[in-house]
Amino acid sequence: SKRYSPPLNYEKSDFSSPGVRGRITRLDNNGTPPQCLWRSFYNTKPCGSYCIHHIVSSLDDWGPCTVTGDVTIKSPRTPRRITGGVFLVDKNPNNSSESRLVVDFSQFSRGHTRVHWPKFAVPNLQTLANLLSTNLQWLSLDVSAAFYHIPISPAAVPHLLVGSPGLERFTTCLSSSTHNGNDSQLQTMHALCTRHVYSSLLLLFKTYGRKLHLLAHPFIMGFRKLPMGVGLSPFLLAQFTSALASMVRRNFPHCVVFAYMDDLVLGARTSEHLTAIYSHICSVFLDLGIHLNVNKTKWWGNHLHFMGYVITSSGVLPQDKHVKKLSRYLRSVPVNQPLDYKICERLTGILNYVAPFTLCGYAALMPLYHAIASRTAFIFSSLYKSWLLSLYEELWPVVRQRGVVCTVFADATPTGWGIATTCQLLSGTFAFPLPIATAELIAACLARCWTGARLLGTDNSVVLSGKLTSFPWLLACVANWILRGTSFCYVPSALNPADLPSRGLLPVLRPLPRLRLRPQTSRISLWAASPPVSPRRPVRVAWSSPVQTCEPWIPP
């Protein structure tokens, strides 16, 4: 009964009922099946405390090396290659005892035949603050059952084959005739016996028991449910949850619903109101065939945890776990030692997440950006490290914008600046000519310092964008500090009342153009305006779904 499970370059596959797996027998040069690698550990002596022999010897009967069972799928169109590889990753950064299955379909993203994902909108930080920074009661719904369990047609299973190499991926240098007592070949086999492999196999043994023998062999699997990325792209996932949110808004117009990818949040004025809405939504979703996971529903109260942020009525801040991790990493950075730019990339990615909540914003990380762009090593000085620590220890919330009328305008020329308010005109000159974008930024900073206005009118697109990383480093840091919490609205140069003062002319005060700030909500599909509900609904409205939600659908 010694049979060998093939590597991934198989010729013909049979599928069994438990996991739709396929195996064939491969013979060595002598015409006999080679011995199973898993059973070889049973006949050897342990090489140490982390030897796989300890796991293998815990059972006397590991069963045959083949999967038995009735073949449920026989397709003559089975392709002669697998679709992707499969591997395990941690459940989340805080839980390494559980794992989730990840399938590698990256071959479809390479070469001239690669498939591009459609672009989908991502809400920025200011949009989240404007939409969700309210004094409401919140809860998060887990709707993953709606799109993670889409059944696949049996005829399409052979086109999504996935291979697992088992233990033999680690022993590529181990030939098929190495189990004959050769010491050097046994040492090659015992190269698997590491602490990481031993702990992983021990965890799998506690879960699967005797089935671990089959997992140690290469095998080929097919899907019974569509995997993420095949049946549902990120774009379609965002559209799907947006449709669910729009449906909830139409039927419950007195609540707030927001969706991003697989995360859907629901808000109401009181907890009692929220509980009533939640019970109704559960029944409505169940009629649509969507089972909400009640155990994963999280009640947040006034502090909504969404996309890694804590959103309250006072603004948006990052979650404490991100701040603590960032502080720990930043304190462990060595001083006066060159760091590879790849390390700087990972550190900058962590710092970027919290940068909008610091006084200097992204501009404080410009030295790291330059080192990464030039692919050179970066040396942290003690002064720069202590400055970053002081910046990231004091975080300021991103507050929601208010719809107010603009009463302060700023403009500049390469040689001068001008400020116009409802009651005065101010102007000045620079010591030497400056680039126009730099001059406009300085004029906006002066207007903010002298008037304290939270809304400024300007005609420069660079200042309007708020991206100051293209300016000189110290100027960008100071401008971020001064203009923090300041909004901008665009005014054409011909209508800008600060245009003439910036040229050294002080005309008579005239009425200012009436410009009102519209809080930024971005044109995103995630917050699409729902059509109003007709006050007179038709009589014959059936909420019952044609899909059976209690019993599985069996084809005729």
From Swiss-Prot:
Family stated for the protein in its record: Belongs to the hepadnaviridae P protein family.
The keyword Transferase appears for this protein: yes
Top-rank lineage group of the source organism: Viruses
EC number(s) recorded for this UniProt protein: 2.7.7.7, 2.7.7.49, 3.1.26.4
Keywords tagged on the record: DNA replication, DNA-binding, DNA-directed DNA polymerase, Endonuclease, Hydrolase, Magnesium, Metal-binding, Multifunctional enzyme, Nuclease, Nucleotidyltransferase, RNA-directed DNA polymerase, Transferase
GO molecular function: DNA binding; DNA-directed DNA polymerase activity; metal ion binding; RNA-directed DNA polymerase activity; RNA-DNA hybrid ribonuclease activity
The protein, known as: Protein P
Region of interest (Spacer), residue spans: 1-59
Function: Multifunctional enzyme that converts the viral RNA genome into dsDNA in viral cytoplasmic capsids. This enzyme displays a DNA polymerase activity that can copy either DNA or RNA templates, and a ribonuclease H (RNase H) activity that cleaves the RNA strand of RNA-DNA heteroduplexes in a partially processive 3'- to 5'-endonucleasic mode. Neo-synthesized pregenomic RNA (pgRNA) are encapsidated together with the P protein, and reverse-transcribed inside the nucleocapsid.
Metal-binding keyword on record: yes
Region annotation (Polymerase/reverse transcriptase domain (RT)) ranges: 60-401
Recorded catalytic activity of this chain's protein: DNA(n) + a 2'-deoxyribonucleoside 5'-triphosphate = DNA(n+1) + diphosphate; Endonucleolytic cleavage to 5'-phosphomonoester
GO biological process, one term: DNA replication
UniProt-listed SUPFAM superfamilies: DNA/RNA polymerases
Domain Reverse transcriptase: 70-311
Location of region: RnaseH domain (RH): 402-556
UniProt remark on domains: Terminal protein domain (TP) is hepadnavirus-specific. Spacer domain is highly variable and separates the TP and RT domains. Polymerase/reverse-transcriptase domain (RT) and ribonuclease H domain (RH) are similar to retrovirus reverse transcriptase/RNase H. The polymerase/reverse transcriptase (RT) and ribonuclease H (RH) domains are structured in five subdomains: finger, palm, thumb, connection and RNase H. Within the palm subdomain, the 'primer grip' region is thought to be involved in the positioning of the primer terminus for accommodating the incoming nucleotide. The RH domain stabilizes the association of RT with primer-template.
Pfam family, any one: RVT_1
Stated regulation of activity: Activated by host HSP70 and HSP40 in vitro to be able to bind the epsilon loop of the pgRNA. Because deletion of the RNase H region renders the protein partly chaperone-independent, the chaperones may be needed indirectly to relieve occlusion of the RNA-binding site by this domain. Inhibited by several reverse-transcriptase inhibitors: Lamivudine, Adefovir and Entecavir.
Organism in which the protein naturally occurs: Woodchuck hepatitis B virus (isolate w64/pWS23)
